């Protein structure tokens, strides 16, 4: 399935599980009372989950190499150019906003049959391709993309996710026979 000693692989898997617990608790309360968690409780849980993921990210991931130079993890590159920007502590704020925002964005699009799944399929498909390329030093040097050590392992996990989403879409398209719920939509958005 995947290399569980790979820190990139574990980061995505652990973040998926943490956000799945957040979504499951909301679905469980919704099942028992008819209403889900309040917005404050839901955002508090997701904020704590996001901070846990960012802490795990800081502790376990290395930087990347780009055109024979090594950069720290707070640097970002503009694709297909030679520009590298070090965001410093603002990088973690950006990570926080992206994780929390995408988790809730996918949750909002889950209201219509097949909408969340269809849009996630294209996004995760593109990310799968990028992780494969970013994990290969030859491709990255040719395309002026950063080489990220051990990130190619995510291709396996994301491919599994793509396959399961394709199977889910068959039963979630109009008229939907099954629904994703918060336990599915929130962790998928956080994974993106």
Locate each region found by the language model.
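Residue-level signature of the cytosolic catalytic core of signaling kinases
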Residues: 85-89
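Alpha-helical transmembrane segments and their helix-start/interface "positive-inside/aromatic belt" motifs
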Residues: 39-48, 113-119
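Membrane-interfacial loop-to-helix junctions in multi-pass inner-membrane proteins
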Residues: 4-11, 31-45
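Alpha-helical transmembrane segments
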Residues: 1-24, 53, 58-76, 90-95, ...
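Membrane interface segments of multi-pass transport proteins and intramembrane proteases
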Residues: 30-39, 76-84
């Amino acid at each position: 399935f995947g290399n569980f000693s790979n820190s990139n692989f574990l980061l995505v898997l652990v973040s998926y599980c943490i956000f799945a617990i957040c979504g499951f608790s909301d679905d469980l309360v919704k099942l028992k009372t008819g209403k889900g968690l309040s917005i404050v409780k839901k955002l508090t849980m997701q904020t704590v989950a996001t901070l846990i993921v960012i802490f795990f990210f800081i502790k376990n991931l290395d930087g990347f190499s780009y055109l024979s130079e090594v950069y720290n993890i707070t640097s970002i590159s503009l694709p297909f150019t030679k520009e590298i920007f070090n965001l410093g502590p603002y990088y973690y704020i950006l990570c926080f906003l992206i994780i929390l925002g995408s988790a809730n964005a996918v949750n909002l699009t889950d209201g219509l049959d097949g909408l969340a799944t269809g849009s996630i399929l294209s996004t995760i498909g593109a990310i799968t391709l990028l992780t494969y390329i970013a994990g290969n030093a030859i491709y990255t040097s040719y395309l002026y993309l950063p080489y990220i050590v051990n990130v190619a392992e995510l291709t396996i996990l994301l491919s599994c996710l793509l396959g399961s989403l394709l199977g889910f879409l068959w039963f979630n398209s109009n008229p939907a026979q099954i629904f994703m719920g918060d336990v599915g939509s929130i962790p998928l958005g956080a994974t993106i």
